[in-house]
Amino acid sequence: MAVMLKPWTVVATVLICVLLCLGTFVDAYPPKPENPGDDAAPEELAKYYTALRHYINLITRQRYGKRSTSEDVMAELLFGDDTEHKQRSRYDDSFMW
């Protein structure tokens, strides 16, 4: 016999899954360093500026490698991946005699 789930249990389960998925995206970036305040000691300010520089370098670092342009992505979605046509040689198709 089939068990009928109550609508609120399904909604609660989906909500918990969404919150867990969003939690993984939050951990993707490092936390921003906290400002020590206006009356902080010079050592604390130097430590803060070092941490801030490291934070900025992490979130703005250059990523190397081939980038797809939006036109390439749209063409691939519309027309499919045509890499097999580019890689094939004309001698791959042998004629049947």
UniProtKB/Swiss-Prot annotation:
It holds the Pfam family Hormone_3. One of its GO terms (biological process) is neuropeptide signaling pathway. InterPro entries: Pancreatic_hormone-like, Pancreatic_hormone-like_CS. It is found in: Secreted. Residues 68-97 form a propeptide. Keywords: Amidation, Cleavage on pair of basic residues, Hormone, Neuropeptide, Secreted, Signal. Residues 1-28 form the signal peptide. GO terms for molecular function: neuropeptide hormone activity; neuropeptide Y receptor binding; type 2 neuropeptide Y receptor binding. PANTHER family: NEUROPEPTIDE Y/PANCREATIC HORMONE/PEPTIDE YY, PEPTIDE YY-RELATED. Belongs to the NPY family. This is Peptide YY-A.
